[in-house]
């Protein structure tokens, strides 16, 4: 197994892409800390699926937009599996809402930046002291971070562009310590994110505009994340990998 006895923390790991990442890491032998914020039922189902397949995992509820939350998450990982962390996958994030510029107030700005960038920054800062050479960090950016996003998604796009730049900066800073840092820039993936924030006709138009003529599946994004966390990607760092069905070739 490629992750045998390695310790992995997955933020937002209870549902959608995060669930698939948690399942796939556990299936390859990792001991997984599945973090979630609010949806306990989905997180518990993720744990059930991992254990039913013979994997090892624990759940930990934490708000990873706060220092206290991420410190508690790291403490929970250490209590369950020991002092070291080998893999961090930052999947926590979200749109919050679609708003044009003149409807964005300070509170909304903070909420979007917190859930998408601050969470990634804080969790990385808390986990890195417990990583050693050979560890890997995988962040979730977005296609929106490259192209500015769709209507009402400007702030979301900015927050994900920050994740992309943070990924490159951390790759430079942590590379001499043997820690790799990469990110995924996902396009249209079939998750609750688009169920909540994208109209069906827009989803269909976006899917039709890709060479593959469909949305991506959560497990397809998770496969890329797991690859980036593995030794198979041992000479990859600082990459923002497009997982978008070939959008830019359309």
List where the protein language model places each region.
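Residue(s) in the substrate-gating loop at a strand-loop-helix junction
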Residues: 142
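Alpha-helical segment proximal to the catalytic Tyr-Lys
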Residues: 129, 172-176, 234
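Short C-terminal tail/terminal secondary-structure segment
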Residues: 98, 226, 237-250
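Active-site helix of classical SDR
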Residues: 124, 159, 167
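A conserved structural motif in NAD(P)-dependent oxidoreductases
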Residues: 210-221, 232
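Conserved glycine-rich cofactor-binding loop
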Residues: 7, 14-16
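Substrate-binding pocket helix/loop in short-chain dehydrogenase/reductase
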Residues: 99-101, 105-113, 194, 206
């Amino acid at each position: 197994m490629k992750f045998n006895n390695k310790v992995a923390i997955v933020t937002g790991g209870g549902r959608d892409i995060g669930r698939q990442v948690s399942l796939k890491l556990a299936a390859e032998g990792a001991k997984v800390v599945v973090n979630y914020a609010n949806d306990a039922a989905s997180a518990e189902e993720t744990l059930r699926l991992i254990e039913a397949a013979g994997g090892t995992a624990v759940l930990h509820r934490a708000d990873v937009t706060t220092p206290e939350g991420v410190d508690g998450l790291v403490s929970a990982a250490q209590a369950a599996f020991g002092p070291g962390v080998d893999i961090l996958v930052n999947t926590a994030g979200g749109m919050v809402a679609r708003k044009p510029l003149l409807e964005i107030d300070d509170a909304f700005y903070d909420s979007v930046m917190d859930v998408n960038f601050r969470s990634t920054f804080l969790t990385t800062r808390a986990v890195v002291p417990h990583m050693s050479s050979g560890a890997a960090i995988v962040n979730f950016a977005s296609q929106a971070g490259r192209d500015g996003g769709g209507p009402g998604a400007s702030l979301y796009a900015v927050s994900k562009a920050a994740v992309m730049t943070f990924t490159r900066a951390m790759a430079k800073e942590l590379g001499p310590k043997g820690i790799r840092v990469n990110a995924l820039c996902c396009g249209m993936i079939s998750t609750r994110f688009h169920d909540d924030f994208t109209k069906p006709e827009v989803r269909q138009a976006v899917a039709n505009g890709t060479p593959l003529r469909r949305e991506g599946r959560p497990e397809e994004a998770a496969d890329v994340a797991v690859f980036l966390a593995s030794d198979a990607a041992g000479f990859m760092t600082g990459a923002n990998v497009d997982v978008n069905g070939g959008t830019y070739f359309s």
